[in-house]
């Protein structure tokens, strides 16, 4: 039987969140989604996130491969399980819940 190990606060390996945001560049809802996502990530994830933006107007293959038919759409790629949020991400509590940040941080 293994002994449980105690880890000092701040020394755990921090999980990086990989996010993919599908947008239609120049569209208002896509701009709002980008701003809302950046705000949420800055507040809750600090330096522990990477956002890949995909403009569906110039990259046709990626949205089809990922089954994206509406913009803006956010996909949580990692940590698994994958999650998808559609819309301009103005429902902050909904986005936090979908990204499973509520379990990590008090809101």
Where are these regions (language model features)?
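Thiol/disulfide oxidoreductase modules built on the thioredoxin-like
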Residues: 64-70
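Thiol-based oxidoreductase modules, predominantly thioredoxin-like and allied folds used
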Residues: 47-59
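Arginine/glycine-rich "motif VI" loop of SF2 helicases in the C-terminal RecA-like domain
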Residues: 42-46, 104
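Structured alpha-helical
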Residues: 12, 51-54, 65, 77-79
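N-terminal leader/targeting and pre-domain segments
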Residues: 1-12
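Ser/Thr/Gly-rich flexible loops in soluble cytosolic domains mediating phosphotransfer, phosphorylation
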Residues: 89-107
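A short, hydrophobic beta-strand/beta-hairpin element that forms part of a small beta-sheet core
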Residues: 71-83
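Local sequence-structure signature of Cys/Sec-based thiol-disulfide redox active-site neighborhoods
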Residues: 10-43
């Amino acid at each position: 039987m293994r002994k449980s190990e105690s880890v000092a606060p701040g020394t755990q390996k921090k999980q990086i969140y990989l996010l993919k945001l599908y947008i239609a560049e120049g569209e208002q809802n896509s701009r709002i989604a980008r701003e809302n996502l950046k705000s949420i990530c800055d507040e809750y994830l600090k330096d522990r996130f990477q956002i890949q933006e995909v403009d569906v107007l110039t990259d046709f293959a990626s949205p089809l491969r990922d089954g994206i038919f509406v913009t803006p759409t956010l996909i949580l790629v990692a940590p698994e399980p994958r999650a998808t949020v559609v819309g301009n991400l103005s429902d902050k509590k909904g986005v936090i819940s979908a990204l499973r940040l509520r379990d990590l941080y008090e809101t």
